[in-house]
C-alpha cells in the first residue's frame, strides 16, 4: 500500500504503545466484495467508527450517535483519516493518552452490495446505504 494513503493515520499513532495495526506490514488483499466495519469506540466520548473498504484502505468516519434501524433517523458522520484494512479486525484497548485512547469493540461487519465510485467520497456529506449479505 502506498505510504501516502496512511500517512495521517501513522502520524497520529505510536505503534510502540498501542496494539493497533500500523498498516506497514504485508498489505492485506482487497476483497472482491467491499467490506464495512462498525466499531464501538469508548474514547473521550462514546462514538461509533464506520469504515468502508475502498482503494486498498478503510475510508473512515466517526458517528457520534449510535446506529438506528429506522432509515428516517439521520446521523452526522465526520470523516477521519483512512485506516489500514487490518484495522477491520481490531478490538482492544488503546492506552490512555494515545490518540483515540479507550476501548474499541467490533460491533458489526459485513460486505456491501452495489457499485460505487471514487466520487462517492468527495465532499463533506454523503449518504451511505449498506446491506448485510
Each language-model region and where it sits:
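A charge-rich, low-complexity, intrinsically flexible signal that marks solvent-exposed coils, linkers
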Residues: 1-133
